[in-house]
From Swiss-Prot:
Protein name: Sulfate anion transporter 1
Lineage of origin: Eukaryota, Metazoa, Chordata, Craniata, Vertebrata
Annotated source species: Rattus norvegicus (Rat)
Membrane-spanning parts: 68-90, 94-116, 184-206, 260-279, 291-313, 346-368, 381-403, 416-438, 476-498
Membrane-topology descriptor: Multi-pass membrane protein
Phosphothreonine: residues bearing it: 13
Summary of the tissues where the protein is detected: Expressed in kidney cortex and medulla, ileum and colon (at protein level). Expressed in liver and kidney. Less abundant in muscle and brain. Expressed in the hepatocytes and endothelial cells.
Length: 703
């Protein structure tokens, strides 16, 4: 047990503080205990397992009917009304028929109602995931021999439209473009859902936390630009080939500029009117949202008016304007996704699963904190995974939590996930009765709805200057992620964001701040001598602070910083002393840190016999951990200082650092060594060092 060498005093009474050593359990014993706990079969365990998988069993019996029902019904109706036009519009992004978007919205709401732990999050179609699904669908369609420029929506698209020079993939002779497109989407969705379920079973909910907020914001920004680019041709009514792969955004805009003369005047006018109405309505809603009890369903009103105008104006027949086409009613028979396609899209499903999980967990945790309850990240993975796995057999594609609809749910009084059942009922009504009424809806109107929904993500670019002032490293992650999404691809943008995030993290720990500390007046506190004026440096003692972990990547910087600030290269000087060469001290300022990165062993450091200090105290409070290289660095440092008759002391070590020091052999086997080297505070270490020095000087004087 560790004991403080100088126990604190309280009211003149000494208080002895001893540390209870941690009881370490071996890996095999830990695995056995967890396996035994997991495999125990009893009624309470089975009940807990079922309640964990289906949280609705726990909260539904406690539902406060009078308090919650009105808000849940209202928010469910509003979200259902918003879902219908968004589902039809987002089918453009996914390259699928609108009916499949409605299926997806219906099943996702029901499954998350049963399995979700968040009371407010809305899980359903999400623009970024729709874009990622659409890119995979387009690529696989082209590989299968279908014309990539053929759109999914519109009349006559259920026919097999093939390239003249392409060879039809075996087994596709009886399956048209739309049939094969939904096969690809369901296979991709099933694989992504299986990844998410597997992550939930393995308790890997923490993995999504490695996708930082700047990364997600930059990814949303880059993906929004890509979505805007993909919808530009629908806004103008221009038919251009679908571009894939490297530089898709640039190639698409070049094709648009080359074919802008072929724009459909009817689509251009309709797009201009719809954009003006939607943007104006959104701005007014944002400005006066405190006065509106229920958000105005602008998208639905625009769709209704546009559909009526297109039908009675015969815009498709007279002006060649592209329309949604036939949207069937009812449900189709379930179908098992094609295993061959699943293997071909397995890699794409990984990025899809990671993005969907990250957005879902981050939104669930954010709204749980703001409303005073907790969510389970692992259960969220299972819930979102099941929202992908089960609906994949019913012609649905990937889903995740969506911020905009979640905000609407909260604003309209949502209290529990019962509102999702109401939303599913609204979608079901459209599926069974109202879907054919959208036959004459122009695709440019759907594109306008998608573009306007990107306002929030595109506005995040205004936050970049503030992010740069706050953290240049985070701003670099934001820019790198967004730029790679736009210039290369969505998947490459995600990888670039993760890479730069890890690089930023490594950079921050590789070169942390280092400083010499001095005493604040007569207090027991010490601060950076270069940052504050009027501090009192302890006589003949150097107090060094390193604000980061000590590990293999920064051990050299640790030594360079220490040697530069103290003016003594201990390794170089100890070697010269062993060789019998006179050593001296540098005349460099002890707090000058301008060349911390350029100081190397022996470069301009001349050390005399009188070093100006007899003890070095390292403030280990910011020292998070030590690895093998860090332990070896401390051992060598103590050895070199000892050769120069300088004492090395450590202060404010955390229990984990103390354990590492003991296991690494830094403290030795006896308790006395720890009490001589480790101190509970910087001040106690400094006072002990000064007291020991005075005792030695007194002993020398007596001799």
């Amino acid at each position: 047990m560790d004991a403080s060498p100088e126990p604190p005093q309280k009211g003149g009474t000494l208080v002895l503080v001893r540390r209870q050593p941690p009881v370490s359990q071996g890996l095999l014993e830990t695995l056995k205990a967890r396996l035994k706990k997991s495999c125990t079969c009893s009624m309470p365990c089975a009940q807990a397992l079922v309640q964990g998988l289906f949280p609705v069993i726990r909260w539904l019996p406690q539902y406060r009917l009078k308090e919650y029902l009105a808000g849940d019904v209202m928010s469910g109706l509003v979200i259902g009304i918003i879902l219908v036009p968004q589902a039809i519009a987002y089918s453009l992004l996914a390259g699928l028929q609108p009916i499949y978007s409605l299926y997806t919205s219906f099943f996702a709401n029901l499954i998350y109602f049963l399995m979700g732990t968040s009371r407010h999050v809305n899980v359903g179609i999400f623009s970024l995931l729709c874009l990622m699904v659409g890119q995979v669908v387009d690529r696989e369609l082209q590989l299968a021999g279908f014309d990539p420029s053929q759109d999914s929506l519109g009349p006559g698209n259920n026919d097999s439209t093939l390239n003249n020079t392409a060879t039809l993939t075996v087994g596709l002779q009886d399956c048209g473009r739309d049939c094969h497109a939904i096969r690809i989407a369901t296979a991709l969705t099933l694989m992504a859902g299986l990844y998410q379920v597997l992550m939930g079973i393995l308790r890997l909910g923490f993995v999504s936390t490695y996708l930082s907020q700047p990364l997600l914001d930059g990814f949303a920004m880059g993906a929004s630009v890509t979505i805007l680019t993909s919808q530009a041709k629908h806004l103008l009514g221009v038919r251009i080939p679908r571009h894939q792969g490297l530089g898709m955004v640039i190639h698409t805009w070049l094709s648009l500029l080359q074919n802008v003369g072929q724009a459909n005047l009817c689509d251009v006018v309709t797009s201009a009117v719809c954009l003006a109405v939607l943007l104006t309505a959104k701005e007014l809603s944002d400005r006066y949202r405190h006065y509106l009890k229920v958000p105005v369903p602008t998208e639905l009103l625009v769709i209704v008016v546009a559909t009526i105008a297109s039908h009675f104006g015969q815009l498709h027949t007279r002006f060649g304007s592209s329309v949604a086409g036939n949207i069937p009613t009812g449900f189709v028979a379930p179908q098992i996704p094609d295993p061959k396609i699943m293997w071909s899209v397995a890699l794409d499903a990984m990025s899809l699963a990671l993005v969907g999980s990250a957005f879902s967990i981050s939104l669930a945790e954010m709204f749980a904190r703001s409303h005073g309850y907790s969510v389970s990240a692992n259960q969220e993975l299972l819930a979102v995974g099941c929202c992908n796995v089960l609906p994949a057999f019913f012609h649905c594609f990937a889903t995740s939590a969506a911020l905009s609809k979640t905000l609407v749910k909260i604003a309209t009084g949502c209290q529990t996930q019962l509102s999702s059942v109401v939303s599913a009922a609204v979608v079901l009504l459209v599926l069974l009765v109202l879907a054919p009424l959208f036959h004459d809806l122009q695709r440019c109107v759907l594109a306008c709805i998608i573009v306007v929904s990107l306002r929030g993500a595109l506005r995040k670019v205004k936050d970049l200057p503030q992010l740069w002032r706050l953290s240049p490293a985070d701003a670099l992650v934001w820019v790198a992620t967004a730029a790679t999404c736009v210039l290369v691809s969505i998947e490459a943008g995600l990888l670039a964001g993760v890479f730069f995030s890890l690089l930023s993290l490594a950079g921050r720990t590789q070169r942390p701040r280092a400083a010499l500390l001095a005493r604040i007046g007569d207090s027991t506190f010490y601060e950076d001598a270069a940052e504050f004026e009027g501090l009192l440096p302890p006589p003949e003692v150097r107090v060094f602070r390193f604000t980061g972990p000590l590990y293999y990547a920064n051990k050299d910087f640790f030594l360079r910083s220490l040697y530069s600030l103290t003016g003594l290269d201990a390794g170089y000087s100890a070697t010269r002393k062993d060789r019998g060469t006179e050593v001296g001290v540098s005349n460099r300022s002890l707090v000058d840190r301008k060349d911390l990165g350029s100081v190397s062993s022996g470069d301009g450091l001349v050390v005399p016999l009188a070093f100006g200090f007899h003890t070095v105290v390292i403030d280990c409070a910011p020292l998070l951990f030590l690895d093998v290289a860090g332990m070896a660095t401390l051992k060598d440092l103590r050895k070199n200082y000892r050769a120069l008759d300088i004492t090395l002391l450590l202060a404010c070590c955390s229990p984990s650092v103390r354990d590492t020091l003991r296991k690494g052999g830094f403290l030795g086997e006896d308790q006395g060594t720890a009490e001589e080297l480790l101190f509970p505070s910087v001040h106690s270490a400094v006072e002990t060092a000064c007291a020991r020095r005075e005792e030695l000087m007194a002993a020398d004087s007596a001799l």
